[in-house]
């Protein structure tokens, strides 16, 4: 009987749904003068593309220059530039071109999912903190 209970529990755990995370990719385009972001959530792209506020994309995917002391990267200002929506990709062109052999990073804030109370209880999400991923690239 105990084996059947363990088998049933194993079956239940094995069938739990794991939400798919968006795989964001960055690519240098236009002779390394612009960055193309692909793999963003289509619902978020649709909502933001209807908004007319010019700095809204910088709130979702800001681009930063990596400081020499990487402990200071949370205090960097985002690079100013132009964000354009092209098909399902977002293209960022900075006001000043990327410097050769300089390291940059993109901070992608993950707004999708995780709005459940159980996610807070399990420690997957903290109140007042938006989870993010830093994507590092070099020109």
What are these regions (language model features)?
Residues 1-4:
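Positively charged n-region of N-terminal signal peptides that target proteins for export
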Residues 6-8:
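Sec-dependent N-terminal signal peptides
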Residues 11-14:
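C-terminal motif of bacterial Sec signal peptides marking the signal peptidase cleavage site
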Residues 17-139:
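Acidic, low-complexity Ser/Thr/Gly/Pro-rich repeat segments typical of extracellular/periplasmic
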């Amino acid at each position: 009987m105990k084996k059947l209970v363990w088998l049933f529990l194993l079956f239940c755990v094995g069938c739990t749904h794991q939400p798919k995370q968006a795989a964001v990719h960055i690519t240098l385009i236009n002779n390394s003068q612009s960055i193309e972001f692909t793999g963003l959530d289509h619902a978020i792209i649709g909502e933001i593309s209807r908004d007319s506020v010019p700095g809204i994309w910088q709130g979702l995917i800001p681009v930063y220059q990596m400081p020499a002391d990487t402990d200071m990267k949370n205090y960097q200002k985002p690079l100013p530039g132009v964000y354009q929506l092209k098909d399902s990709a977002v293209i960022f062109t900075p006001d000043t071109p990327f410097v050769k052999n300089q390291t940059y990073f993109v901070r992608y804030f993950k707004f999708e999912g995780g709005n459940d109370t159980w996610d807070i209880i399990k420690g997957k999400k903290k109140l007042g903190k938006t989870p993010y991923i830093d994507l590092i690239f070099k020109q």
